[in-house]
Amino acid sequence: MIAGGAASRYGGAAKGLLEVGGRRILDRVVASLAEAAGAAPIIIADEPEARAWRRDLEVVPDVLPGHGALGGILTAVETLGPTLCVAWDMPFVPGPLLAALGAGLAGADAVVPESDSPRGVEPLCAAYGPACAAAIRAALARGDDRAVAFHRDVRVARLPRERVLQYGDPAVLFFNVNRPDDLARAEALCRSRASYR
């Protein structure tokens, strides 16, 4: 689970500690990752207080601090090898979707789900293999810390939108809480469907 970035759009607050439907977003993501991987997730974070967020989980600091989510992905693949990466501010990512992404790593270096975003994929809910590490380091050396900056240099497979739709609406699945109005929207989504609780 990547708990990176300064959360500047949320006033610097620890977004994963906010509650949606009576549960912290962090706990929602942990449950989905554990369901998909069959093991306890690891938190990638540079925050000194990160160990207190979930005392039952290991916390690994970024290998290259200050590079946001891409630094978190780098840390995950260099520390863990093949891994599922999910941003800690995405309250509605289901475990079965993550399992499908992980299964795709057999034939690719990265597996990203197609989304409705302008870039067409969601790189902060994806599976990454160790071959991504060198490409991420090269992107960071170029000064490019976008989460997709290294995709052109590795074998990327896409989980087609049709498959993503089997798990729900991509606009909800990949919804992230960046601002107070996003939290209000997440609460409304949670009330609207039992599957989002």
Language model: regions and residue ranges:
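Acidic, Mg2+-coordinating catalytic module of metal-dependent nucleases/exonucleases
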Residues: 180-183
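Conserved anion/nucleotide-ligand pocket segment
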Residues: 175-177
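Nucleotide and nucleotide-moiety/phosphate-recognizing core
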Residues: 1-144, 152-173, 188-191, 196
